[in-house]
Amino acid sequence: TADLTDPSTQTFLSSLSSILVAEFPVYYAIAKETGLLEDLTQTWGADNANKILAIAFHWMHTSSNSAYLFKSWVNGKLLPYWDSMESREMTEFFRELTEQPDWRKTFFNARIARLPEDEVLSYDSTRIATEAVANPYVQCGKGKEGGYQKQVGLALLLGHKTGMPVFFRMFPGQIADLSTVADMLLRFDEINDKKKIFAAVMDRGYFSLDNFAKFVDHDSRVIVAATMDVKWIREAIEKAITSLWEACSHIRGDVFGVTVPVKPKFEDGVERELWVHVFRSDSKSSTETQAFFADLEDFESQWKDWDDDAHTGACPLLNSRKLIYYRKPTGLPGKSTLERDNEKINEAIRYFGFFCDVSTMPARAAEVYDNYCARDLIEKAFRSGKSDVEMNVARAHSDVTLEGRFLISFVALTILTDFHRRMKQKTKRIVKGKAVVDRPIGDEMTLKEIRNYLASIRLINDGRGNRIWQKVTVRQHNIARRLGFPDLYRELPDWGPR
């Protein structure tokens, strides 16, 4: 037992300090495994790469991207960079990041190079509120809550198979989403000088012949959800319809699909070929049919039971769109019987259970279906960015500092999307010589709950460069294991302050 009165013992004890570890090793391990740390280092150097990660860790840990809070937060934590930064210093750092020559090509090309050859990208954009004044990207636009606010646009490309964000671009807040797509993909092609990506996937908001003309003319490989009531889409469905009950058209479950090449008429008279991928789902058909006839039955019941004496003003049933499914009534509601127009009803229900995508390149219906089903990844990524790193608020006064902020958000988003991917994976462990499969940890706890469980983990530094773990619980080790890092809180980290 050491003599606590001994001066050397007292000196040793006074040199001991503990630092908060929490979930930071998970973030760092993900940054290494995804190649993010290497790509940041290649683009901006090791010191700046560590600064970028430390700021991203701050934003993820606190769910706040306020620059002025970093100084009061950074001390006593295991971080890749641990010196404090004033708000002004951080703003200058954001500026320096975007003034690095060719950083976009170097960094994004490095991220793209890590994608598999058959990767599919989802495109989406969002508008972010800002208080910035001297910024050409900031425009006044209508907010989701109504009214007008200053906004800047952010567009993102995210890989389906990897779940990784690979490219982002700012645009003025008042520019419509449709105007950013071709530009985004064109810039992506300019930056990407090696890898041919299978396609970019977009939602129904981008469906129009004008957009398809731009995509084809720019040689952009895209998949877009189709609007079903368009003539050339209906014609494609009619060509495919007899094949959608055949075994060769089966994709999975109750979904069947057929691809139909089409050459719709473009306004400029130029001939362009597109591919309509027509799908049929029995469960979708059943749901839509039940809902349709339930609405008709409810309407007929209201018509039959209508009592003019119990209401004032004109009867709203007389203006209902549902009347198109009936013969012309012989009298008023409550005083006549409705007769269904079966021809109109047949027209309405003919395409129940059908849905379509359109691509600018030939592809099998099955691979288009698989790729479009994965599109919700980008929507989840944006939601995570807004809730976990406050990406819905941009605190910057110039376009260069704003882009620097978005770069940090992009880094945080890369780590978070991989974190969420790991939360969805099953893991194996050996118990008494037998393999046991654990269900995904995301089935049991949220990201914030995982952070809370890891929040107590600390390291002790002895002032001589040596470290030792404070108590790490079995639960904390199991969380790390189920995230794919079984030894994360056993092996001593070789980074951070000592």
Where are these regions (language model features)?
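Active-site beta-loop-alpha junctions of metal-dependent nucleic acid enzymes
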Residues: R169-I191
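An anionic, glycine-rich sequence signature occurring as long contiguous blocks
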Residues: K150, F167-M170, S220-N371, L447-R498
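Dynamic "connector" segments at or just before major functional cores
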Residues: T1-A134, A155-Q174, A348, I378, ...
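Secondary-structure capping and boundary motifs in well-ordered enzyme cores
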Residues: A49-N50, T62, E86, E119, ...
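Short amphipathic alpha-helical "interface-anchor" segments enriched in bulky aromatics
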Residues: V368-R395
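Acidic, metal-coordinating catalytic cores used for nucleic-acid/nucleotide bond scission
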Residues: A176, V201-D210, M228-K231, V400-L402
